Amino acid sequence: MAKLFASVKRLPVLAGCVLAAASYPPIPADLTTPVQQRLAINGPNSFSIGWNTYQKLDQPCVQYGTSSDELTQQACSSASVTYATSRTYSNVVTLADLSPATTYYYKIVSTNSSVEHFFSPRVAGDTTPFSMNAVIDMGVYGVDGYTIQMDEAKRDTIPTIDPSLNHTTINQLANTVDDYEFIVHPGDFAYADDWYLKTKNILDGEDAFQAILEQFYAQLSPISGRKAYMASPGNHEAACQEIIVGLCPTGQKNFTDFMTRFGETMSTAFPSTSAAEAAKINANKAQLLAKPPFWYSFEYGMVHFVMINTETDFDNAPDGQGGSAGLNSGPFGAPDQQLEFLEADLSSVDRTVTPWLLIGGHRPWYTTGGGGCDSCQAAFEPLLYKYGVDLAIFGHVHNSQRFQPVFNNTADPNGLDDPTAPMYIVAGGAGNIEGLSDVGSNLTYNRFAYADDFSYAKISFLDANNLQVDFIRSATGEVLDTSVLYKSHKAQFVVQ
């Protein structure tokens, strides 16, 4: 980042040479036109539909059904909210009592909307094999972001070439949309806080920040409006920029857009379907302690998935008050609430129902090229090991990495053959204006590291004992690395 900050020091000189030019998308003539659509798993047999409009809606509604010609059901809400500096309103409707694993068609009620479709969530315990994708650190492309012609040998430099409006990761997700069932994105969306890296934005940072958010979520909507898109925070959601946060206007700090956009769509925690009374009690406790979209969990078929917040709400959190990142955000819960949630949630997982236990968060503590989060490791790693998390997915470092299962900086001697330690991956190479990160010094327990091109991870649940991780090159779809984790899952409840 040193070169990036050196560039920032020159901004006052550049400011006298440019005109303000925030690149807002055009506002549709029909202000009820839905934009920035996003879906999420909201609960058992429950799906949330989120979208934005350029005016407040008195009653956001969605029509839906199992045939595109017969949208016989309708759900409505009163959730149409905005914040200072935003041009749009966020709307959310939840569809409940859906038949599991079923294709539904839906239409957001507007005089200018179309019929789309989604696949409803699998019930916990469904043993049908399926795949999901992990996409992290993905930013806007085009005039305010990166382009596929960027010279990836130049790390942390400002791209100055003309854009090619082609986002290779989103294109690959679109081309393979029938090959996966949902996406997890643990942090760093859009990179709106990097608005100052384009000189045209220097005199109009407030509008440039909002324009980038509108651009990015419009670019993402062909995917997020079709597949459940499960979000948790990263450092680039915190404020309007990471250098002098105190200059950010109201509405552009303390994760405001992230909370407004995703807060009502994400789940809390699912009620336990275990026969064990303790599991039900712990799941109910987790449900009360959850704070979506910052920390929460959901179940889908063979997997129990937990999203954590590596930015705030634990000791020495980097983005918290007085934290090392200087973003002074949060807290969003009571003291220790996130860790109490995590312990309650992990202890509720019945492996006879959901054999696979996965974690998603933003900042990794195992990484080959620097950027590891020591305070995150101190807060979270003991719980991940204690309750037998199988796979932990992180980003923040802009490349792809896979590690042998590891605990307390020591590789598990069993490798991928029934380890007790979690397997860790970094899937931060989806593409953003800051470029890719060098692989760096190779740790002894690293098994794959790639920073030559944009990429993401595909996780396939083959059965109750075998999980496959593939790293995909976004531009071509080729598999860069593949591995299969075997877990015996002998214990109904893991405590070690």
Label each region the model flagged.
Residues 1-14:
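Classical eukaryotic N-terminal signal peptides for Sec-dependent ER targeting/secretion
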Residues 7, 20-23, 350:
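Residue-level detector of alpha-helical hydrophobic segments embedded in or interacting with membranes
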Residues 11, 18-20, 301:
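N-terminal processing/targeting junctions
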Residues 15-29:
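N-terminal signal peptide
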Residues 26-436, 448-450, 458-496:
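Metal-dependent phosphoester/phosphodiester hydrolase catalytic core
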Residues 440-448:
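An anionic, turn-rich surface loop/hairpin at beta-sheet edges
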Residues 443, 453-455:
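C-terminal structured "cap/appendage" subdomains that terminate the fold
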